[in-house]
Amino acid sequence: MTSRRQSHEPPDVIARRGWRYHHLGIPTNIPRADETYLARFGLYVSGFSTSPYGIEWMRFEESSPLHPLIKSLPHVAFEVDDLDSALIGQEVISPPGSPSDGVRAAMIVVDGAPVELISFRTAGG
């Protein structure tokens, strides 16, 4: 029998796996003044660097190659120490890739919702 999490307890991925909240990605169709265009994803992103809560707005081109769940539902992103290990046993909808220097990220689906896992390479690693 699986035990249920109490209202005062953090989710399992935080409490037992050590995943750390990174950001919340929210799809939108409204252009924003501070957008950055990521051509290979057909995606405009904004808000991440200025939001005190880590909210990232994502506006997709119709031709975006990303998975439909990523384009239609908000996602939570967690920083993980070992991306490859974190992906074991997960349903991957966007395989590991490097959206920018020093960053590896992948998207999984959990209970029908997209979840992003991110790892960062440090100056010595």
Task: Give short role names for the model-derived ranges.
Residues M1-T50, G54-P68, E91-G125:
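Vicinal oxygen chelate
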